[in-house]
Each structure stands twice: as structure tokens, then as C-alpha cells.
């Protein structure tokens, strides 16, 4: 009953991973976290990545379910049969090409499921992650679930206008592209 969360972007559970983790019955599952964050390219960080890959091989292949939030070399090359891998992609859509839709160092393989925000993303996610269209699960994204909670929205709006009172009764446009600093 082991579930593994594997991220090469954060050294703590965040966003979708944290929301999923908080909804798991941890008394029923053994949870493993393989989390590592690299601030910059260096020989030391390359060595840490190698050690992390060895750890990933062990954790992935002793788990029943593995959740990832980005491309994963170890899953693509060393996943044993019977392990279910769920890609919880870090973006909420596919505005640009990515994954197997672009030229890459290695093809993405061995993913069993991908979660998507809407039916619109089934085709690009299927292509990018080499999964059958039926295995692209349109569930929405855990990190945006709270945006449908009216109490949360009212509280956020109230706090926003307390912080920026001059913006009250103004039209507000949000531009929020993906940026991970790498």
C-alpha cells in the first residue's frame, strides 16, 4: 500500500501534491516522499541527482502508486510492471508543446495516467506523455479546487482589497505564466 510522491522541483510537498496528500487516508497507506530541489547546475548537484535517481529506482519499484509532477527519467526507463504512475502535471493546460510533442533527450514512457483540467487537454496530454486517451483523467486540478469555494473567494477578495484599496472598482487583469526559475 505504498504511495510515492516524486518531485525534482521542490523539497517539500506543495500545490497539487499537498492537496492530494491531505486527502489520503494515511493510516491505510505508507507514504514515501522523494523530493529534491536544485538551485543551480553544478557538479555537486549532478552528483545529488545521481543519488536521487538511485533512491527513486528503489522507491518507485517498491510502491503501488507513484505520483509525479514533471518528466521523470527513472519512470521512463526503470519502472517495473505493476507499479501505477500518475502524472499530476505542474501546468493546468498545454499552451506550448512539451513532453513527447517536442524533440527531447529521451522519450517519456511508462506513465499510466495523467490528470487534466478539461476534455480540451486530453489529446495534447495523451501525445505528450504517451498514454492512451482513456487514461487521461479529466478531474480538474487539485490546486484550483478551492477557487470554487465561495467562502474562500469572498475571503480572498476581502483581503486583496484591504491590501490594495485603490484597485476597488477597477478592472483587474491577471497574467500568470509558468516560471520555475530554470
Annotate each language-model stretch with its function.
Residues 13-23, 144-182:
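Conserved catalytic-core segment of nucleotide-activated headgroup transferases in glycan assembly
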Residues 2-3, 84, 170-173:
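Residues that mark the start of a beta-strand
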Residues 1, 72, 158-162:
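A short, compositionally biased domain-edge/stem linker segment
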Residues 4-151:
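Active-site and donor-binding regions of nucleotide-sugar-utilizing enzymes
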Amino acid at each position: 500500500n505504498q504511495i510515492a510522491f516524486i518531485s525534482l522541483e521542490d523539497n517539500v510537498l506543495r500545490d497539487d501534491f499537498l492537496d492530494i496528500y491531505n486527502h489520503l487516508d494515511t493510516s491505510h497507506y505508507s507514504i514515501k516522499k522523494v523530493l529534491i530541489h536544485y538551485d543551480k547546475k553544478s557538479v555537486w548537484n549532478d552528483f545529488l541527482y545521481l543519488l536521487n535517481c538511485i533512491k527513486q529506482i528503489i522507491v518507485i519499484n517498491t510502491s503501488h502508486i507513484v505520483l509525479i509532477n514533471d518528466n521523470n527519467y527513472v519512470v521512463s526507463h526503470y519502472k517495473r510492471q505493476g507499479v501505477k504512475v500518475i502524472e499530476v502535471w505542474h501546468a493546468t493546460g498545454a499552451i506550448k508543446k512539451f513532453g513527447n510533442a517536442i524533440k527531447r533527450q529521451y522519450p517519456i514512457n511508462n506513465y499510466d495516467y495523467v490528470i487534466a483540467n478539461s476534455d480540451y487537454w486530453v489529446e495534447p496530454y495523451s501525445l505528450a506523455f504517451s498514454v492512451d486517451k482513456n487514461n487521461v483523467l479529466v478531474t480538474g486540478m487539485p490546486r484550483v479546487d478551492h477557487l470554487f469555494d465561495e467562502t474562500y473567494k469572498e475571503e480572498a477578495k476581502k483581503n486583496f482589497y484591504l491590501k490594495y484599496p485603490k484597485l476597488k472598482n477597477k478592472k483587474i487583469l491577471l497574467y500568470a505564466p509558468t516560471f520555475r526559475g530554470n
